[in-house]
Regions:
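Extracellular/lumenal/periplasmic "stalk" regions immediately C-terminal to a signal peptide or transmembrane helix
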Residues: 1-31
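A broad detector of the eukaryotic-type serine/threonine protein kinase catalytic domain
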Residues: 4, 44-46
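Short Gly/Ser/Thr- and Asp/Glu-enriched loop/turn motifs at secondary-structure junctions
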Residues: 32-36
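Short, aliphatic-rich beta-strand segments
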Residues: 37-43
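Periplasmic OmpA-like peptidoglycan-binding domain that tethers envelope proteins to the cell wall
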Residues: 46-64, 68, 72, 82-171
């Protein structure tokens, strides 16, 4: 019953997030699977090309993302930076690994400024190794350049949820 309530709260948050950012915005995708919220944001909404400095436009979206995370103090949010497969280097950043991690930490700093508890945040860079689509065209490369926010139960709570579900399934 508690999980059902949590799920309905999560769904309410997600639908309000979709409404506030504009459900038809192709640069933002929001999904909920088994109590985990996935928010994927195109890099063109967050950063200028090759940069890890968060744009002013992004801050409105990040305010809403911060609310989703702050409303779930028992959850963690992993911020994953993703790039396309084009080699990248600009003197400061060595490659796509650097760019993906720097983008993740830039988003984390913004979320922290917006009041999210830093102990809930995890920085992750995926470079170009988890593409949504192949990197053959400019359009596809643009789809692969994104930041994904994964809001999930803390690992010990996650195991507790699984254990409870297993007990329910076995009729204990």
């Amino acid at each position: 019953d508690a999980i059902t309530k949590k799920d309905s709260v999560t769904l309410a948050i997600v639908s309000s997030l979709k409404k506030s950012v504009g459900i038809d915005d192709p640069d933002i995708e929001i999904n909920v699977e088994k109590g985990v919220v996935f928010i994927s944001i195109s890099d063109k909404l967050l950063f200028k090309s090759g940069s890890y400095i968060v744009t002013e436009k992004a801050k409105t979206v990040l305010e809403k993302v911060a609310k989703v995370i702050s409303d779930k103090p028992d959850f963690e949010a992993m911020i994953e930076g993703h790039t396309d497969s084009k080699s990248f280097s600009n003197g400061v950043l060595l490659d796509n690994w650097d760019l993906s991690v720097k983008r993740s930490t830039s988003i984390i700093r913004e979320l922290q400024k917006l009041g999210v508890n830093p102990s809930q945040l995890i920085a992750a860079g995926r470079s170009s190794y988890v593409p949504l689509v192949d990197n053959e065209t400019a359009e596809n490369r643009a789809k692969n350049r994104r930041t994904r926010v994964v809001v999930m139960p803390k690992i010990d709570q996650f195991y507790d949820m699984i254990e409870k579900e297993m007990k329910q399934l076995s009729g204990e």
